[in-house]
Amino acid sequence: MYFSSLCKFLPISEKEKIYLNIVKKRFCKSNIYYNNNNNNIINYNKRGLKFYPFCNNLKKNINFVNINNKKGINFHSINKERKMASEVPQVVSLDPTSIPIEYNTPIHDIKVQVYDIKGGCNVEEGLTIFLVNNPGKENGPVKISSKVNDKNVSEFLKDENMEKFNVKLGTSKHFYMFNDNKNSVAVGYVGCGSVADLSEADMKRVVLSLVTMLHDNKLSKLTVVFEINVDKNLFRFFLETLFYEYMTDERFKSTDKNVNMEYIKHLGVYINNADTYKEEVEKARVYYFGTYYASQLIAAPSNYCNPVSLSNAAVELAQKLNLEYKILGVKELEELKMGAYLSVGKGSMYPNKFIHLTYKSKGDVKKKIALVGKGITFDSGGYNLKAAPGSMIDLMKFDMSGCAAVLGCAYCVGTLKPENVEIHFLSAVCENMVSKNSYRPGDIITASNGKTIEVGNTDAEGRLTLADALVYAEKLGVDYIVDIATLTGAMLYSLGTSYAGVFGNNEELINKILNSSKTSNEPVWWLPIINEYRATLNSKYADINNISSSVKASSIVASLFLKEFVQNTAWAHIDIAGVSWNFKARKPKGFGVRLLTEFVLNDAL
């Protein structure tokens, strides 16, 4: 404004020179249109300059010299009059319009058979692995006590040959030899440590050692002999983890999928009292795919997974499972006055999409449950941009992990078909981006329950979307509301990468979640909601601020914020920010699918 007022006293010719100099120095680099005949010249006419108000008085076309003398600067813009080719908005025609999802994976083709170990184990082909421990001796020698129905292999596995190796957790060895039928077989072990009862973390280390051997060897058959004691839940967890870790996600590679990968066709398991474990096999396969389905959504980059394509994937899933579904668009959300949720998505080119799938069992419904997943398909932080070291902006495609867990649970529930329940799978999906339309720090927005919220930080967006989703869930008249979200990075500091935190307003419901945590082997720790911290959310101008005035206990304070949007319904909030992503393996865990499914199947009634 100051510069323009000075220029009005200059002659027109001098003013034009100053304007042109500014355009050349400040704006040309982002708006260069090359002449095909001469890459050093661009034609910048009045139409191009009209977007800069101080250039509107220029009366002629002007040829500018290319100031950087470099060939090829891509500049993409969206024309308001452009008609989109598909439901998913695109900047250029090459932009993806759907999320590639594998429904039939090689794991589904593996034939699994469970045998009783009392009859001895056969070593016929492929790889045979003994899971061994030595209670009380962490580095104790390997001793294989199972009967082996093969003389050559049995001779090799005698104590004098194996005692040079130890059972330290995760250690493994395998050897090639000929069996009695002169067939080449691989036989080995995985150490399970010194404890009699393995934890889920211990079992995962065992499985990872086993998967490494499978990936290193092209085999058609795997046989696992359990010389350790496991209950049914841990046995199922072994199978789920084996299937999940064995499967590789190569959807976005240009080469043929799994061109160098040959999956086994048969899995044999020897264990005591085999009949009690057989029923867990198919359930494990369902849990595996529910988790892998969620993982596929989380792993999909944000140019593939956006609010529209994610809602399309939810509809596709519902149709496959015969679930009821509806997707609410911006118009319906405006009618529901979801101002908090709508504000977060204002900066994105993709419209908000609210996912609502419903499973209704046949017969009497004893419990109605709403599962609510946070669904931010990419979180830039908004105007409070994730620019600081450690903000992990490159990983923010995973901020819809809660939504993915809920949809993965929908797959499991729709497949296993529990009785006497009605389940609502909900997610307020949007993208938190920076643009001229984005909501700003300091804005005051109104949620669907009428509460006004001062936006203290645009990077505290998840709680705003969940606020309206929780209000929506309670209006469904459900008995329980459980939300699951990558809500606060503080969970990494409080519980690390192994445990999720659970908060809530109902002790009975939280205990059900904790029990589901044990049976699903997805660890959850009960954290308190401390009401005296509510004062840190006070706002001078609105009913509440979306961020605390203190940096302390931010996960608890975030739960206090959510609590404001649930009135009379039992509610639990599960924060999975620390456990959703496997940082070492650089892939999603799909955390929460088994936890929520176990809750629905066994603990909700």
Swiss-Prot record:
Oligomerization is required for catalytic activity and is metal-dependent. The type of metal that binds the 2 metal binding sites influences catalytic activity and substrate specificity. In vitro, activated by Co(2+), Mn(2+), Ni(2+), Mg(2+) and Zn(2+) with decreasing strength. Occupancy of the site 2 is essential and sufficient for activating the enzyme but occupation of the 2 sites is necessary for full catalytic activity. Inhibited by fungal metabolite bestatin. Inhibited by Phe-Naphthyl (PNAP). GO terms for molecular function: carboxypeptidase activity; identical protein binding; manganese ion binding; metal ion binding; metalloaminopeptidase activity; metallodipeptidase activity; peptidase activity; zinc ion binding. Its main location: cytoplasm. The keyword Metal-binding applies. It is an enzyme of class 3 (hydrolase). Keywords: Aminopeptidase, Cytoplasm, Dipeptidase, Hydrolase, Metal-binding, Protease, Zinc. Zn(2+) 2 binds at K374, D379, D399, E461. The active site is at K386, R463. Changing Y533A: Loss of catalytic activity and impairs oligomerization. Binds 2 Zn(2+) ions per subunit. Two metal binding sites with different affinities are located in the enzyme active site and can be occupied in vitro by different metals. Site 1 binds metal with low affinity and can be occupied by Zn(2+), Mn(2+), Co(2+) or Mg(2+). While Zn(2+) has the highest affinity for site 1, catalytic activity is the highest with Mn(2+) or Co(2+) and less with Mg(2+). Site 2 binds tightly to the metal ion and can be occupied only by Zn(2+) or Co(2+). Changing W525A: Loss of catalytic activity and impairs oligomerization. A peptide binds at K374, D379, K386, D399, D459. Optimum pH is 8.5. Active between pH 7 and 11. Optimum pH is 8 for the cleavage of the Cys-Gly dipeptide. Homohexamer composed of dimer of trimers. Both the identity and concentration of metal ions available dictate the extent to which oligomerization occurs; Mn(2+) and Co(2+) induces oligomerization, whereas Mg(2+) has no effect, and Zn(2+) causes irreversible protein aggregation in vitro. The L13 loop movement regulates the transition between active and inactive conformations by repositioning Lys-386, which, in turn, mediates the rearrangement of the binuclear metal center. PANTHER family: CYTOSOL AMINOPEPTIDASE, LEUCINE AMINOPEPTIDASE-RELATED. This is Leucine aminopeptidase. It comes from Plasmodium falciparum (isolate 3D7). The gene is LAP.
